Amino acid sequence: LLIGWCCMNFRLTKGNFLKTGAYIDGDSAIFTFAAEKEDACSIVLLDKSGNTACVLDIPAEYSTGSLYSVRVHGFCGNEYAYYFKINGKRCIDPYATRILGREKWNDKTRSENDYEIACGIDNCDFDWKNDSFPEITRDRMKLYKLHVRGFSMDAAGDKKHKGTFEAVSDRINYIKKLGFTSILLMPVYEFEEMTIPVKHDIPEYAKPKYSIRDEQSVSTNKQNDKVNFWGYTSGNYFAVKASYASDASDASNELRRLVERLHKNGMECIVEMYFPDRTDHNLILDALRYWVMSFHVDGFKLLGDKLPVTAIVQDALLSRTKILYDGFDMSVVPQNRTYENLYIDKEEYQFAARMMLNHINCNMYELLNQQKKQGENAGFINYISSNNGFTLSDLFMYNDRHNEANGEKNADGPSWNFSNNYGCEGPSRKRFIREIRKLKWKDAMLLLFLAQGV
């Protein structure tokens, strides 16, 4: 059966409704995606130059419920990119395991093709050999949080490797020598780091009238240079950030090699996942399972409200995967679990510690409770500084935040940080101020190391 227009001899049959997304199955590919039976749906295949190679119109007979599923016989996964067209609108597969078009970080030339991206299929041919999960217990766990690009941009050697998984992999021994057992990666799923201008259609009668001279002086190509460096935004949760790889076409395997090397060193890899409020709960669960099975990650730090936390903690496949979140309903946690995989990650500890260190309304009873707290069914993640607010250095150097230079009018970040500048706002040349600050840094680290949590 040939459907749509196409120069290739593809044959379509019904697919597999139990697995959403696109994947290779023998000499064919199966595409399963969400759409209503009444929708006009097609799969657009692109060649390696990004040009349309084939359009496959999908009839309603291949739909069940709100899903379409079709098997495309004769499909070669590495030859084509794809996207869905639903009722004439270009749609990116939320289950795509590769995203094409963001291979270079903050690539301003993308404006030339309206920032378009397409989907690809990860071949998942990595040989894990005898890889095993370290399963580090919470009494031994020490967590090192990093941003792949920021952590390794100053890496020595080949410029190609700066800011990549490979550069992080080269620093595993450094992290291990510091005494850390686990690394926490800020988002490494594919996300849009660029600020894409929103287009608005203006009726002809409302368009401004320019003279030829005026038109020459009007810039129609203004770009917002703000970059989402951290990645806390909705994303393509099944694809690895291609610009974090030394070889963008092999980003998935480069991350797998990083995880494999961590495991060989007895260390864990935990990844942050941010899900906005309206994210489909089935997609969230599928994404977490996929990262465990495909990338062998050891845990997740979950960010976002209204997440299906109960379903996550009850999921049998995730029962030995560390879950970091700001709270759990312990009444729904299975009682027969032998591995402690739940960790409460919130800012309670840092506030109590900062107030004591900087002598700001310190409550010693509260601090001692924070120092000794340890749940029966869940551990606690303790920290005094993080990427969400003051660094440890800033904590004893500034009374107030100073983010004027980042274009947010000094409004981003917490307005109250329980900090103290000890006599001078910002860096100081005075010896006694510098000595006080050094002592405070040491006090803070000692306080944290003596706490019962992670």
Q: Where are the regions that the model predicts?
A:
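Structural beta-strand segments of beta-rich domains
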Residues: 27-31
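Conserved, mostly hydrophobic/aromatic
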Residues: 33, 84, 146, 175, ...
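Active-site neighborhood of glycoside hydrolase catalytic domains
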Residues: 254-257, 261-332
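Conserved alpha/beta catalytic core and glycan-binding cleft of carbohydrate-active enzymes
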Residues: 296, 309-454
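Short proline/glycine-enriched turn/loop motifs at strand-loop junctions of beta-rich domains
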Residues: 35-40
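An acidic-aromatic substrate-binding cleft motif
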Residues: 124-186, 190-191, 229-231
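The feature marks proteins involved in alpha-glucan
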Residues: 8-26, 53-55, 62-145, 153-159
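Aromatic- and acidic-residue-enriched carbohydrate-binding clefts of CAZyme catalytic domains
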Residues: 157-163, 195-264, 275-294, 405-426
